[in-house]
């Protein structure tokens, strides 16, 4: 009787995972940022770091699997004039890290804890609109990337 019960339990539980999707097979960004794939360009761990006035610094990295230099267009949606082009050579390009390519969009009005709509495109490839997380420098790891605010404009009195 004991062997029969043990066999029944073993067979009854042996197939538990058959109908359940394995979590390790799902692709996801295992970081705070997001990933974007457009043609030969693969953006990894893209996120925005902001300061107290809402300026936006884009950080992350781009892998160019192609053999030619490309211009990547990054546009922060919902703001006027907040777009830039970034030169991406074959191989790895860091964005906003170690002064390789500082990318700051001043006056963006982004808020930490929210997502910013960012359109990314290059060459003749279709672009993608993605939601990029916005963080501030409260976490020590991101503090060095907080953009410096522009100095106040100088006005001359005649």
Task: Annotate the PLM regions.
Residues 23-36, 129, 134-158:
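Extracytoplasmic/periplasmic copper-protein system
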């Amino acid at each position: 009787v004991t062997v029969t019960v043990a066999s029944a339990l073993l067979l009854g539980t042996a197939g538990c995972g058959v109908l359940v999707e394995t979590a390790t097979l799902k692709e996801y960004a295992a970081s705070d940022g997001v990933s974007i794939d457009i043609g030969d360009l693969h953006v990894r761990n893209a996120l925005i770091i902001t300061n107290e006035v809402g300026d936006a610094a884009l950080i992350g990295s781009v892998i160019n699997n192609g053999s030619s230099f490309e211009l990547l267009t990054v546009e922060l949606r919902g703001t006027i004039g907040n777009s830039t082009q970034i030169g991406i050579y074959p191989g790895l390009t860091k964005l906003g890290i170690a002064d390789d390519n500082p990318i700051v969009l001043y006056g963006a009005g982004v808020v930490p804890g929210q997502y910013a709509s960012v359109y990314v495109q290059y060459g003749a490839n279709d672009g993608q609109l993605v939601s990029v997380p916005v963080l501030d420098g409260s976490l020590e790891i991101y503090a060095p990337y907080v953009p410096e605010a522009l100095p106040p404009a100088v006005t001359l009195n005649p």
